[in-house]
């Protein structure tokens, strides 16, 4: 992960490709600045998060869809398959249509869970750095 000192010129255009890529548990999404400074939702070229999230029920998914409709003018919809995934595997449905998803963890979620529960500072950054020593990029 980068140190967070990139310039807006380093940002990457947003790309939303649901239902192929959405914020189910284990997916990678690009970090970004907030809508007030980044209304085009451009992605960081150096920072990302790994989605852990939660398991949803229909009421929570309906609430998420309302919020997503507000910021996408109704252009981004949770499909029945996405809803089922959120109700069984979990994730972060509230991020759909707002953050670019670009990959997934295929093994090692137990390590992600350790990172998730690490002690953090006032900016929600882990006190101790975590390093990814090995990653494999595959094409679907």
Regions found by a protein language model. Name each.
Residues 1-140:
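Cyclophilin-like peptidyl-prolyl cis-trans isomerases
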């Amino acid at each position: 992960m980068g140190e967070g000192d990139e310039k807006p010129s380093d940002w990457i255009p947003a790309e939303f490709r649901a239902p192929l890529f959405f914020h189910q548990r284990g997916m990678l999404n690009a970090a970004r600045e907030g809508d007030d400074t980044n209304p085009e939702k451009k992605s960081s070229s150096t920072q990302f998060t790994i989605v852990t999230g939660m398991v949803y029920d229909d009421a929570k998914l309906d609430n998420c869809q309302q919020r997503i409709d507000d910021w996408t003018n109704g252009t981004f919809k949770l499909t029945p398959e996405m809803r089922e995934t959120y109700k069984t595997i979990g994730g972060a449905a509230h991020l759909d249509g707002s953050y670019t998803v670009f990959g997934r963890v295929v093994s090692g979620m137990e390590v992600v869970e350790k990172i998730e529960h690490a002690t953090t500072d006032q900016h929600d950054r882990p006190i101790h750095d975590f390093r990814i020593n090995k990653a494999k990029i595959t094409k679907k």
